[in-house]
Amino acid sequence: MRKPVRIGVLGCASFAWRRMLPAMCDVAETEVVAVASRDPAKAERFAARFECEAVLGYQRLLERPDIDAVYVPLPPGMHAEWIGKALEADKHVLAEKPLTTTASDTARLVGLARRKNLLLRENYLFLHHGRHDVVRDLLQSGEIGELREFTAVFGIPPLPDTDIRYRTELGGGALLDIGVYPARAARHFLLGPLTVLGASSHEAQESGVDLSGSVLLQSEGGTVAHLGYGFVHHYRSAYELWGSRGRIVVDRAFTPPAEWQAVIRIERKGVVDELSLPAEDQVRKAVTAFARDIRAGTGVDDPAVAGDSGESMIQQAALVEAIGQARRCGST
């Protein structure tokens, strides 16, 4: 049996505690070796639960020879610096989305990973859930005719006042935290370059951080995409594809629980069919894929899942940046 990929973690984020590190400790392909924080108490808390070492400071973790790859759940505003340092230290990287806050930083890091022959992945977990490939197969087989319109939404209730996602200096805001999901889904189904026709957002009065937004995109073929996202909503995570002869609807699209049995609803000529799929743990699948690709010598331009490549990450960053520029022109 091959040795597991040895993982070091930069930062003690809630999502790492709840979802990613339990999966990394559970699958045979990875071993969590150490967790680094600038707060020793946080590092010790993580280390106690996940039976690994606590490290004070991110650089000290990167200097360790017993770590093959790092997982980066830091705030987005810190990603460019520490992903870059991890790659310079010859570590493979799995980073939470967004990879960085600018298209130029994303392109720079992808270029660095290419030169160092290292794996760099942006952690869009939903891409690892098989139902989205089923939906794309249905679309490409003509089940709903020609695609006319794509709609995707992701909204969550308000966060605690102290949540770092309300801090603009750390790359906070609804667009970079959850708006990126509908944008990535639009790219998954519409394919090719997307143009931002318009965007608007609602911002917090004091901090200026964006709390919600709407986006209108268009593909080269003329198909439009409507995206909605925000921190001030009843929970909703869904998308639909509206074609010339029918419609496909997917609920709990981006963050389904591992035990969730996905249902794809297909509407055609007044008839509704529901396609039930087995439950999948997209977190475990993402972790396993990352480790597998490291062992296989997969590079940044060899996708683990459709579209998950260096060039795709650059395209995603450029689209999100364009949305951000457009929303600032139309924000309230």
UniProtKB/Swiss-Prot annotation:
Catalysis: reaction(s): dTDP-4-dehydro-2,6-dideoxy-alpha-D-glucose + NADP(+) = dTDP-3,4-didehydro-2,6-dideoxy-alpha-D-glucose + NADPH + H(+)
InterPro entries: Gfo/Idh/MocA-like_OxRdtase_N, Gfo/Idh/MocA_domain, GFO_IDH_MocA-like_dom, NAD(P)-bd_dom_sf
Pfam families membership: GFO_IDH_MocA (PF01408), GFO_IDH_MocA_C3 (PF22725)
Enzyme Commission code(s) on record: 1.1.1.384
Gene Ontology molecular functions: nucleotide binding; oxidoreductase activity
Active-site residues annotated for this sequence: K97
Superkingdom classification of source: Bacteria
Chain positions recorded as NADP(+) binding sites: C12, A13, S14, F15, A16, W17, R18, S37, R38, Y58, L74, H79, R165, D177
Binding site for substrate: R19, Y235, T255
Keywords: NADP, Oxidoreductase
Gene knockout outcome: Cells lacking this gene accumulate the pseudoaglycone (PSA) containing tri-O-methyl rhamnose, but lacking the dimethylamino sugar forosamine.
Family to which the UniProt record says this protein belongs: Belongs to the Gfo/Idh/MocA family.
Job description of the protein: Involved in the biosynthesis of forosamine ((4-dimethylamino)-2,3,4,6-tetradeoxy-alpha-D-threo-hexopyranose), a highly deoxygenated sugar component of several bioactive natural products such as the insecticidal spinosyns A and D. NADPH is the better reductant, however NADH can also be used.
Assembly and binders: Monomer.
Listed name of the protein: dTDP-3,4-didehydro-2,6-dideoxy-alpha-D-glucose 3-reductase
Organism placement in taxonomy: Bacteria, Bacillati, Actinomycetota, Actinomycetes, Pseudonocardiales
